[in-house]
From Swiss-Prot:
Stated name of the protein: ATP-dependent RNA helicase DRS1
Effect of A273T: No growth at 13 degrees Celsius
Entry's free-text remark on domains: The Q motif is unique to and characteristic of the DEAD box family of RNA helicases and controls ATP binding and hydrolysis.
Disulfide bonds: none
Originating gene: DRS1
Biased composition (Basic residues): 40-51, 694-705, 735-752
Free-text function comment from the UniProt entry: ATP-binding RNA helicase involved in ribosome assembly.
Assigned protein family: Belongs to the DEAD box helicase family. DDX27/DRS1 subfamily.
Motif (DEAD box): 385-388
Length: 752
């Protein structure tokens, strides 16, 4: 509050509300102590401005030269919240593109090629009659949504699927139904065989109660933590700068996972936590980390926290989450170590020893081995986000190397939406009686997610046309964010070209793109420059882009866990969302659908989600498919032209590389060679071993006993004796008896 009355305008001492006028001291003023007022030098035009100048001159007489005239008290700083627009996917150095714009072209502009071929101009034409029919279908679907709910006795039961398929005769339908029944019987037999094998191997797969009691902290700790619910972040006894950062993000009430984990993490205990996608797991580990770092030694720069993540985009997002929460905390620094970005910039940043380093495993090991003055000797906290993915075969070697480099006396925090790792895989992490906190039932989708399934049958060739029609129905104006998941990078690229030729602007995200292209695709999608993003499972974990309304599974995932991560990109943080999945006829596809329906039925009391069968007008889709097939030559031309441009760019890059080698030969040769913890042969061997372990078949009890007998007998083969074996044994015994009898007779004669 500022006191600005004329009565006290010449006083150096300004009274407050609590001071009485009688107590105000009379201060003598001398000419020497007069402060010269700053005069305004800006020229102002107009009559109104002249008045402002005169008022400003009078005010300037009262302003001390050491004070900023434009300073204002922000009385409501703690209560105001910014309009949060999502996390930033620009890495350090990427946002300042003024200097970077001058660099040579590195990537092919695919949209430019598509426009040259007539695409991205206008949307593909749909007849008005068909549009009217689709509107009627929408109304019917809304009215009959309850009739379309899927039952547990198979896929499509309880839903009138494929009403629009008029070309199929009744005989063909009956034959298909018989085939499906036979397939289902075969699948059930396979499932029972698999179950039989698994039941026999319970000792190997499931952890015993004794092992859990020895490894984990008492269950009461986790149960008590889950019961605690806090009304706001103030009740968690967090510091004021952290609370201010949370308020700026609009965080008001802690989510269940945050209420359970933050108090335990502040105590320094190890945690293994799981909750549904979009429940605030990143903030659940970042808040206690920042709170603990407030009390670090101020004068000693060292890296105290390592956060490991499986993908680069997720690492960049988590880094931005941490920076936003710690924006009002002074002295906490962040470092990013991910592949695909400038290596030298990362080395310079890591030389300053940031408090928190967020990294992917490969680049983290690279920096530890090859970056000067970067070490992990003082690390106190290790965080593994998407921990179940990090513990899989692909990261096993890197993870073992990192565990050997980090100090053993540290706090470990493991988080994932599908955290179901066995003790055997967790032993290498050196956990110390971790507290196990599982907020939601395992393998459960978000509470407000509507899961829809489209049965493809034998129409795989119609999937591109189906995707186009579905996106047009779900988002005719192009104002919704839709994510499409595919199995292969080539499929994502081809679909982008097909959709572009049909007039739909889409982006792609997969491992074949450069890191700059990947970040550019995510940012364009986030800013709604491109409403549809076609991606592989690279984007299935962790990415939190606000207001993704629909997820489409163009290709079925390999497992139900991956399916949960995919559909978890929508219906986040209590919002509603929809997923549409194209289901084939394989047993794997059907098992995932069964698991999804089962999860919805088992958690009906806890969730508002539904599992529905979606009706499709296949006649209209076949018309669209004819248009797609007519573009096959154009698609091939675009792919060839793109390949040629890539070859030209690659040749130019090699030319520049050669020029640099000639110009800076001595500097380049003087650089030390970068080392790695594995040789090329070791990498190949680990890949082969990983493939063999993944393809290992489940054995039943008899086979397992035979294998155990072989192992005990040092490879000796055990089998039942045949008739010839028994005859041979009898002959041997007779010979032995004869020889013993003859020896006895000889001995008796010699005694005589």
């Amino acid at each position: 509050m500022v006191v600005g009355t004329k009565k006290y305008s010449n006083l150096d001492f300004v009274p407050t509300i609590s001071d009485s006028e009688d107590d105000v001291p009379i201060l003598d003023s001398s000419d020497d102590e007069k402060v010269e007022a700053k005069k305004t030098t800006k020229k102002r035009k107009g009559k109104n401005n002249k008045k402002k100048v005169s008022e400003g001159d009078n005010l300037d007489e009262d302003v001390h030269e050491d004070l900023d005239a434009g300073f204002k008290f922000d009385l409501d700083a703690d209560d105001t919240t910014s309009n949060f627009q999502g996390w930033n996917f620009l890495a350090e150095g990427e946002s300042n593109k003024d200097d970077a714009e001058a660099f040579v072209k590195k990537d092919v502009d695919l949209d430019k090629i598509i426009r040259r071929k007539g695409g991205l101009v206008k949307m593909a034409h749909i007849d008005s009659k068909q549009e009217e029919e689709t509107e009627k279908e929408k109304v019917e679907k809304e009215n009959d949504s309850d009739d379309e709910e899927l039952a547990m006795d198979g896929f499509g039961m309880g839903a009138p699927m494929n009403n629009g398929d008029e070309n199929q005769s009744e005989e063909e339908e009956e034959e298909e139904e018989k085939e499906e029944e036979e397939e289902e019987e075969e699948e059930q037999e396979e499932m029972t065989l698999e179950k039989g094998g698994k039941d026999d191997e319970i000792d190997e797969e499931d952890d015993s109660e004794e092992a859990k009691a020895d490894f984990y902290a008492p269950e009461t700790e986790g149960d008590e933590a889950k019961k605690q619910m806090y009304e706001n972040f103030n009740s968690l006894s967090l510091s004021r700068p952290v609370l201010k950062g949370l308020a700026s993000l609009g965080y008001v009430k802690p989510s269940p996972i945050q209420s359970a984990t933050i108090p335990i993490a502040l105590l320094g205990k190890d945690i293994i936590a799981g909750a549904v996608t979009g429940s605030g797991k990143t903030a659940a580990f970042m808040i206690p980390i920042i709170e603990r770092l407030l009390y670090k030694p101020a004068k000693i720069a060292s890296t105290r926290v390592i956060v490991l993540l499986p993908t680069r985009e997720l690492a960049i997002q988590v880094a931005d989450v941490g920076k936003q929460i710690a924006r009002f905390v002074s002295g906490i620094t962040f470092g990013l170590a991910v592949g695909g970005l400038n290596l030298r910039q990362q080395e310079q940043m890591l030389k300053s020893r940031p408090d928190i380093v967020i990294a992917t495993p490969g680049r983290f090991i690279d920096h530890i081995r090859n970056s000067a003055s970067f070490n992990v000797d003082s690390v106190e906290i290790l965080v593994m986000d998407e921990a179940d993915r990090m513990l899989e075969e692909g990261f096993q070697d890197e993870l073992n190397e990192i565990m050997g480099l980090l100090p053993s006396n540290r706090q470990n925090l493991l988080f994932s939406a599908t955290m179901n790792s066995k003790i055997k895989s967790l032993v290498s992490l050196s956990l110390k009686k971790p507290v196990r906190i599982m907020i939601d039932p395992p393998k459960k989708a978000a509470t407000k997610l509507t899961q829809e399934f489209v049965r493809i049958r034998k129409r795989d060739h119609l999937k591109p046309a189906l995707l186009f029609n579905l996106i047009r129905k779900l988002d005719p104006t192009g104002q919704k964010r839709i994510v499409v998941f595919v199995a292969r990078k080539e499929t994502a690229h081809r679909l982008r070209i097909i959709m572009g030729l049909l007039g739909m602007s889409v982006g792609e995200l997969h491992g074949s793109l450069t890191q700059e292209q990947r970040l550019d695709s995510v940012n364009k999608f986030k800013n709604l420059e491109v409403p549809v993003l076609i991606c592989t499972d690279l984007a299935s974990r962790g990415l939190d882009i606000p207001k993704i309304e629909v997820v489409i599974n163009y290709d079925m995932p390999k497992s139900y866990e991956i399916y949960l991560h995919r559909v978890g990109r929508t219906a986040r943080a209590g919002r509603e969302g929809r997923s549409v999945t194209f289901v084939g006829e394989s047993s794997q596809d059907r098992s995932i659908v069964r698991a999804a329906i089962k999860s919805v039925e088992e958690n009906k009391s806890l969730t508002q989600g539904k599992a529905l069968g979606r009706n499709v007008d296949w006649v209209q889709i076949e018309e669209t498919n004819k248009l797609v097939e007519s573009m096959n030559d154009t698609i091939e031309d675009i792919l060839v032209e793109e390949k040629e441009e890539k070859e030209i760019l690659r040749a130019e890059m090699q030319l520049r590389k050669g020029e640099n080698m000639l110009k800076h030969k001595k500097e380049i040769q003087a650089r030390p060679r970068r080392t790695w913890f594995q040789s090329e042969s070791d990498k190949k061997n680990s890949k082969v071993l990983g493939a063999l372990s993944r393809n290992k078949k489940v054995t039943n009890s008899k086979k397992r006993k035979r294998e155990e007998a072989k192992a005990d007998g040092n490879g000796a083969r055990s089998y039942r004796k045949t008739k010839t074996d028994r005859i041979a044994d009898q002959e041997r015994t007779f010979k032995k008896q004869k020889s013993t009898n003859s020896n006895k007779k000889k001995g008796f004669k010699s005694r005589r």
